[in-house]
Amino acid sequence: MTIISDVYAREVLDSRGNPTIEVEVYLESGVLGRAIVPSGASTGAFEAVELRDGDKGRYLGKGVLKAVENVNDIIAPEITGLDALDQVAIDKIMLDLDGTPNKAKLGANAILGVSMAVAKAAAEALDIPLFQYLGGVNAKQLPVPMMNILNGGSHADNNVDIQEFMVMPVGAKTFKEALRMGTEIYHNLKDVLKSKGLATGVGDEGGFAPNLSSNEEALQIIMEAIEAAGYKPGVDIKLALDVAATEFYDEDEKLYKLTGEGVTKTAEEMVDFYEALVKKYPIVSIEDGLSEDDWEGWRVMTERLGDNIQIVGDDLFVTNTERLKKGIQTKTANSILVKLNQIGTITETLDAIEMAKRAGYTTVISHRSGETEDATIADIAVAVNAGQIKTGAPARTDRVAKYNQLLRIEDMLGFTGQYIGNEVFYNIKK
């Protein structure tokens, strides 16, 4: 019933109009599992390799026909005839087939597409939701959404250095209420921007992307929008930042160049900057506040801010257990951002989450800036009781698909579902 009978990959488009890979896994019972792989704009240097064709005459070199070929010609023959319920074994076979530490041979996009589609086919065959298949009977916690309502950095074409300004509806009682609160703030933010004569075009993840005089002005405008929506900053709503500092770090000079503000800072000065913002605004989480290789700077930031706010490693850890292990040993950061395509298989993703939780780190399940209608990350967030999800603004179908899936999951869980709000920050003083 759960034996794989066929595997097929094709090239499709993501939300930025770039090619990505879709994989279909068919079982002997006729069941189909289908998955589409996302793609990032600000990518960590230590991420698994996303295989692109490089043929400038086709999709400006961004085609993925080679990855598609690797699935159809190399991976498919090896896993056809295997049981889709053997997720760990199938993922291991693909890792062995690739044989490189960063999936450079077959491509993380090829491997992940198959890994996700196998899991979906298995869940479908058992007639249970994906979150329940991956997480078992204890998968019950709906995540607090980190809603990216204002964009800068490489996710937008403006002069704001910080990549994402997010609201977290920690005061909600249910996920449904949290989504409503965040959405109302988003619409009020549009009105606030209009009233100031600022642009209301959106970035890759659906957040607004106006030109502002400073990074702090973005926070001030969001505070206005929260109050205009009738909510109390710091009580109903907390703020989160994704700085993506690697994007403006000068490796040679060891300096952070915030070109939007026309200033240059050392790691210590960046931490001073964050400390001042945290004192002034209800910021509960800062992601990638320093460069992915500035381990000493990260240690200082964790030492100074880690008791009071969530310090999230994205480019720092790239969902990789080896880099996470180093972070745990050196007391660097206190939270990990989890992106499936940074590491490339369901199994390795779950391993990273387990390692983080055992060390007392919080986990944030995340989308990529180049997304699709695939909502797998919504199921994974509930499967592992992550407590937090980052999947953009309540706009653009590629983002809303994940929120709508979480609404469905909340309905499926009924009274057993939990939304714990502020309690997701279990390792800091709230």
Curated annotation (Swiss-Prot):
Key word Cytoplasm present: yes
Enzyme class: lyase
A cellular component term, taken from the record's GO annotations: extracellular region
Location in the cell: Cytoplasm; Secreted; Cell surface
The protein's Enzyme Commission number: 4.2.1.11
Gene designation per UniProt: eno
Taxonomic superkingdom: Bacteria
Catalytic activity: (2R)-2-phosphoglycerate = phosphoenolpyruvate + H2O
Co-factor(s): Mg(2+)
GO molecular function: magnesium ion binding; phosphopyruvate hydratase activity
Keyword Nucleus: no
Protein name in UniProt: Enolase
CDD domains the record matches: enolase (cd03313)
Protein's pathway: Carbohydrate degradation; glycolysis; pyruvate from D-glyceraldehyde 3-phosphate: step 4/5
